[in-house]
Every structure is written in structure tokens, then in C-alpha cells.
């Protein structure tokens, strides 16, 4: 299990960005542990961008969250029942979590289908979401799989985004659905969970826009700006 702790060098609050299980290769590439440890290892652009404002340190275990305040998970591996209980308890005791969970991940991989090192195609956190009164679904529509969403002043581009649905009586959380169901903002005990029904939006092919970067020096789409704003947000929707 691999993750990383990030401390905001400008504004103060701690941010834990965890890639537990290495399913979405945001830390380095897909060359394996040996390549990650090489002197010339290159971080994923999303990780590198966050590192410009945050001090990044390794995180390996859910139990290490005890003294942390904010956690980000991007399409993580399946958690054990014990880990799910620990994660839920941490949030209820005041933790804040941002999860990017994808029902149909399109993120490119060096590994073939069936290889355990390949990113998970669909999120494995359904038990946790159901406990919070939510279900992650993939909408059936005739629209093109490539999606551009306008969120505030930002334009977000991704592929096959999912949608959150409320189930039952709301489970053990109070959740508000925003952005057409792409975002769920949940009050859970003393803590808060922000859930994005998509993880592909972290992939550079959807936001970096190298031609645009040459011309303007900025991103073509605001995917990373949106994720960072949610991770550091202190104003709940509900």
C-alpha cells in the first residue's frame, strides 16, 4: 500500500493524498517499485503540480490517519472490512475526505486486462458508499463519452463520468448532490466527505493540453484546480 502525506506550505492545513494500493498511478508511473525508486523517476504531472504547493511525504496505512485532517483517495484498491470501519470512524471523528471513484475508468495502462497491476476498472468502495446512503452508477445516455462540465468558472473535461444516487433513507450520513450528481457533499458525524463520481479527470490527457500550455502557460481545462479547491474547502454545501 502506497500513499503520500501533503502539508500545505502556504495556507497551513494538512492534506493527505493517498494512492493506497497504487491503482491510479498518480505518484509515479507504472514502471513498478524499482522504477519509482530510480534517480530519474518522474512523478505524474498531477502529483508534481500538487507538490508545488504541498510538502509530500509517504503514507502506507489507514491507521496512520489518526493525526491527519484531510485525505484524498483516487480509485483506490478494495479495502478490507476493518479498513472501511477505520476510515468511516476517522471521518466521523472530524476527518475530511475527498474520494474520486470511477464506475468505468478509462485511464491508460501499460498492463493488459486482468493484470493485478492495472488500475481498477470500477470503484470497489460500494460498501462504504452504501453505508453513507449513496450508490455510484454509470448513466446510460446517447451522448458522447467525452464530457465537458461547467463548474463555477471552471471547465472540467473527462470521460464516462458517473453519477451519485441516494439510496434508502440516507444511511448514516446527510448528503447533498451537486453538479448533476457528479459531486456528493456529505456530513458524517463531525467530519465531511466530498465524493466525485469520476477519477479519469486526474489523467493528463483530459486537462493538461500541451498546445494550450505552450501558448498560455496554463492548463486547457480546470480539472486540477477543481480537485484542489474541494480538497482544501472548509465550507460545506449542507
What are the roles of these predicted feature ranges?
Residues 1-238:
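Short, surface-exposed patches at the edges or C-terminal ends of soluble domains, predominantly
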Amino acid at each position: 500500500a502506497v500513499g503520500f502525506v501533503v502539508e500545505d506550505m502556504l495556507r497551513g492545513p494538512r492534506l493527505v493524498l493517498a494512492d493506497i494500493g497504487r491503482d491510479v498511478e498518480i505518484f509515479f508511473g507504472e514502471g513498478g517499485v524499482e522504477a519509482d525508486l530510480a534517480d530519474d523517476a518522474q512523478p505524474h504531472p498531477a502529483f508534481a503540480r500538487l507538490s508545488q504547493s504541498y510538502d509530500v511525504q509517504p503514507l502506507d496505512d489507514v491507521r496512520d490517519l489518526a493525526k491527519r485532517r484531510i485525505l484524498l483517495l483516487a480509485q483506490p484498491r478494495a479495502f478490507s472490512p476493518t479498513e472501511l470501519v477505520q476510515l468511516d470512524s476517522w471521518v466521523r471523528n472530524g476527518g475530511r475526505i475527498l474520494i474520486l471513484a470511477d464506475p468505468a475508468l478509462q485511464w491508460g495502462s501499460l498492463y493488459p486486462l486482468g493484470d493485478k497491476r492495472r488500475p481498477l476498472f470500477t470503484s470497489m468502495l460500494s460498501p462504504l458508499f452504501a453505508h453513507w446512503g449513496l450508490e455510484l452508477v454509470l448513466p446510460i445516455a446517447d451522448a458522447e463519452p467525452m464530457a465537458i462540465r461547467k463548474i463555477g468558472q471552471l471547465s472540467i473535461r473527462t470521460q464516462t463520468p458517473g453519477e451519485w444516487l441516494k439510496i434508502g433513507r440516507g444511511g448514516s450520513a446527510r448528503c447533498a448532490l451537486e453538479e448533476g450528481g457528479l459531486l456528493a457533499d456529505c456530513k458524517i458525524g463531525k467530519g465531511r466527505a466530498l465524493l466525485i463520481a469520476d477519477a479519469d479527470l486526474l489523467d493528463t490527457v483530459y486537462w493538461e493540453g500541451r498546445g494550450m500550455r505552450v501558448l498560455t502557460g496554463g492548463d486547457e481545462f480546470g480539472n486540477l484546480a477543481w480537485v484542489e479547491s474541494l480538497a482544501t474547502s472548509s465550507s460545506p454545501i449542507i
